[in-house]
Amino acid sequence: MKLSLSWIKDFVNIPEDMDMKQLAYDLTMDTVEVEDVEYLADRFDHMVVGVIEDIEPHPNADKLRVCKVDIGDGEIKDIVCGGINLEKGMRVAVSCPGAIVRWHGEGKPVEIKKSKLRGVASYGMICASDEIGLGDLFPASQEAEILDLSAFDVPAGTTLADALDLNDVLLEIDNKSMTNRPDLWGHYGIAREIAALYNLPLAEIKPFETDVQSDFNVELADPDRCPRYIGVEMSGVNVKEAPYQMQSRIWKVGMRPI
């Protein structure tokens, strides 16, 4: 089970200077076995938000273009790209030299370096979502589609982790260590344990209340085997895209958001 530290902090105010390895050790010794601590932003080292200032045709390749990109360091960079949805003014994910990507989301990870593509110098790489591990969070609708970050109103040069709220710590917990503790199968349960460990206040979750009445009834055919059954009837549900913060949280803990 993966847990997001920023999500846990909704319920308990963990000090900013707390050592995450110490937290993992204390949880392991007291309650559950923490198998791994991951600083999520490390996946996006040397990746920033860039703004495409201009687009020129590639002199030696019909399917490639030369983008003039502002990455916030005061110098416009030439980056060769084959994306089909490139536009002037578009915010994009730029992998600078030193970043680790997967070409077209496949194969082994490779390190980005300054290079020449068909005779034109290219500073880095303008990325599709699956090339930087974000394919489930930002699914592409067509092949060779570049990740469009124009909805994120951040300056050129903002680190990708900061721009997308991915500067988080993930705790991976061994499910076998809490099989008999269903109260720990989520962020609030672990937050409660952390609050108890360090004598921190725990935020209260207010129960959901509604005045809506329903004709939905449940009859217990065998009360000895099923002494209690709780059902909820829901109506008026509209299927639509979830807010980005919710999608991001779901993605962080290893699930695919809708």
Where in this protein do the model-derived segments appear?
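Phosphate-backbone binding interfaces of nucleic-acid-interacting proteins
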Residues: 1-208
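Glycine/proline-enriched, intrinsically flexible loops and inter-domain linkers
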Residues: 4, 12, 25, 39, ...
